[in-house]
């Protein structure tokens, strides 16, 4: 691995409708096979469903849902001597967002509603209310970190 300069994070353009970089990133996470227009239609459709159901601001519900899903700590495998330990480590801010979005989309895909926009809207609303599969996933990760707190001194 070359020890040259560290390549910086690429700047993502804000989405055209709401001007949010976070939402633009989320559209990219929802995207499958490079079909961005389809993923934009799904995300914007889900936000419209949320606005009609709750009467709240679209982005406010989206932000609240992501806040409830973002993990603070996670476990990483660390091999010491012949044993592998699950070591709790703090999650970097960029990875927090990435994990939250990935878990949200995965949970939405497993739901039973007809269209993906409806599934995504349902999961976003559940996450905003601290319910749903994506919030459960975050709780499981936190529980794993809590259970392995004794190995925190194996940090790297």
Curated annotation (Swiss-Prot):
GO cellular component terms, A-Z: small ribosomal subunit
Annotated PANTHER family: RIBOSOMAL PROTEIN S7
Keyword hit for Transmembrane helix: no
Stated role: One of the primary rRNA binding proteins, it binds directly to 16S rRNA where it nucleates assembly of the head domain of the 30S subunit. Is located at the subunit interface close to the decoding center, probably blocks exit of the E-site tRNA.
The name this protein goes by in its record: Small ribosomal subunit protein uS7
Keyword annotations: Ribonucleoprotein, Ribosomal protein, RNA-binding, rRNA-binding, tRNA-binding
Gene Ontology annotations of biological process type: translation
Alphabetized Gene3D superfamilies for the sequence: Ribosomal protein S7 domain
Keyword field contains Ribosomal protein: yes
HAMAP family membership: Ribosomal_uS7_B
Taxonomic superkingdom: Bacteria
PROSITE patterns: RIBOSOMAL_S7
Family, per entry: Belongs to the universal ribosomal protein uS7 family.
Self-association and partners: Part of the 30S ribosomal subunit. Contacts proteins S9 and S11.
CDD domains in alphabetical order: uS7_Bacteria (cd14869)
Molecular function GO labels: rRNA binding; structural constituent of ribosome; tRNA binding
């Amino acid at each position: 691995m070359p020890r040259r300069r560290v390549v910086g994070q690429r700047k993502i353009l804000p989405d055209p409708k709401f001007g949010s970089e976070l939402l633009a990133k989320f559209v990219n996470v929802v995207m499958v096979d490079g079909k961005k227009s389809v993923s934009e239609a799904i995300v914007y459709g889900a936000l419209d469903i949320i606005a009609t159901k709750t009467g709240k601001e679209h982005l406010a519900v989206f932000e609240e849902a992501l806040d409830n899903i973002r993990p603070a700590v996670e476990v990483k495998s660390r091999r010491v001597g012949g044993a592998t330990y699950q070591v709790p480590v703090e999650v970097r801010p960029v990875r927090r967002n990435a994990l939250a979005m990935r878990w949200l989309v995965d949970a939405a895909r497993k739901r039973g509603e007809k269209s993906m926009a409806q599934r995504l809207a349902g999961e976003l609303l559940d996450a905003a209310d601290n319910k749903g599969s994506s919030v459960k996933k975050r709780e499981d990760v936190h529980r794993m970190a809590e259970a392995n707190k004794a190995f925190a001194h194996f940090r790297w």
